[in-house]
């Protein structure tokens, strides 16, 4: 069961992990000129936060006693929406539904690639109604939604890197769903165990920057998962705790421009050093529900 107490950011975090890299070490730029990065036009889906609220606590970031300003959430969300349009991307808008406050976290609704749409099967009953809403939307835009027998929480735990899917498990998505996803998509799936409930979805601890490059926060993963990531992505950007705990890795990249929480300043510097263009946005009101940029953004892969 997830710890629903609000996270503590004091020094006990450092003591908890035997494996720890200091932020100053992690943020050090690599020697040499950065690689040339090329943006690619993307298609996204988003759901306006018209009914956003923290009405229950199903992750450590949610505090039902903390007030939520829906108008601020809507303004921050709209800024993100306009940022994608300004960068040249297209955005499908999904109609929000009253009683489903977490629909704004559209990435969790499914996984779409190669004309195949897998609809989420949520772990918590509070979000079960979203599956029907997203399946209906998928059908309305021409897909035939595919369901899984086991829990999968969409792009919250399923991230595409080139022609490979990185798949998280440990808190939400059932590892047994990974084989189902691989069979449906016809793509290799790499299972990665998450071990810190504050990083309950893969997209809170790992960001895909282009078809060959990722950034991640190692302490969120098991030792075996860290070894897998190190072997698969030896040039990955390793992010420190200061940026991880403001959900800096809950980011969206088009291959050049990386939209990320504005508070993740160290990660932004790392991105610049690696040849990317960080684009900071403030989604602090939506972070109260345990989500940020990527959570609000479902990428529709071609």
From Swiss-Prot:
Amino-acid positions noted as binding substrate in the UniProt annotation, renumbered to this chain: 102, 127, 172
Active site as annotated: 201, 295
A Pfam family annotated for this UniProt entry: DDAH_eukar
Molecular function, one GO term: dimethylargininase activity
Keyword annotations from UniProtKB, A to Z: Hydrolase
Catalytic activity: N(omega),N(omega)-dimethyl-L-arginine + H2O = dimethylamine + L-citrulline; N(omega)-methyl-L-arginine + H2O = L-citrulline + methylamine
Family (UniProt): Belongs to the DDAH family.
Function, as annotated: Hydrolyzes N(G),N(G)-dimethyl-L-arginine (ADMA) and N(G)-monomethyl-L-arginine (MMA).
PANTHER family: DIMETHYLARGININASE, DIMETHYLARGININE DIMETHYLAMINOHYDROLASE
The name this protein goes by in its record: N(G),N(G)-dimethylarginine dimethylaminohydrolase
Originating organism: Mycobacterium tuberculosis (strain ATCC 25618 / H37Rv)
